[in-house]
Amino acid sequence: MVIKSYAKINLSLNVSKRLNNGLHDIQSLFCLINLFDEITIKKQKRAFQKDKVYFSGQFAKDIKSSDNSIQKVLNILRKKKLISNYYSIKVKKKIPVFAGLGGGSSNGYAILNHFFKKEINDKTINTIAKHVGSDLRLFFYKKGFLNNINRAIKLKNQDKLYFLIVFPRVKCKTASIYSEVKKYSPKKNIFEKEII
């Protein structure tokens, strides 16, 4: 079975402040797009007591196999005793990395969704997002306006949008971009009525 892990686009993004847990309070109008990584999951034999995450494809070389959102999600699930087995996971990367398209967070959510599709709710996704990254929540809500750390609002307008994605091969790490927030103060927060 191949799992599709979709990319996202922020149609607007307001980063208002840094939170105590190191993540950032964001407001974002977003949607998923038809660009995806392909993930396959296989249970390890009992003798193996470690997950193996393999990345392939033209965007795989910059990803650490031991420190990525997939491994973080697996570690959290195992710590909470929600899974006990270990897995071999292969990811064919089609989403450019360090491009703001959420590929890493999408991969992490795809794994979470694979194991607990019917059990994921607002509380679950927010708890895990605090340890993996704020963008994880975008893939739970799929489309809408994410307002602050715990709230999402679905868009009333569900029209199809078309995009031309251009990747200039300039790496922009999310953590590095967000770290610049401390150097300025946003003039104001975005209110729901202004954008929906």
Regions found by a protein language model. Give the residues of each.
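ATP-binding N-lobe of GHMP and related small-molecule kinases
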Residues: 1-99, 117-119, 123, 167-170
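A generic structural signal for well-ordered coil/turn residues at beta-strand boundaries
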Residues: 5-9, 35, 140-142, 159-162
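Short beta-strand-to-turn element immediately C-terminal to the catalytic PLP-Schiff-base lysine
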Residues: 14, 42, 116, 139-141, ...
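Alpha-helix C-terminal capping segments
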Residues: 39, 77, 108-119, 155, ...
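Conserved, helical-rich catalytic subdomain that frames metal- and/or nucleotide-binding sites
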Residues: 49-55, 68, 141-196
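DPxDG-like acidic metal-binding loop motif
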Residues: 99-125, 138
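Short, well-structured alpha-helical segments that form the helix of a local strand-helix-strand
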Residues: 121-132, 194
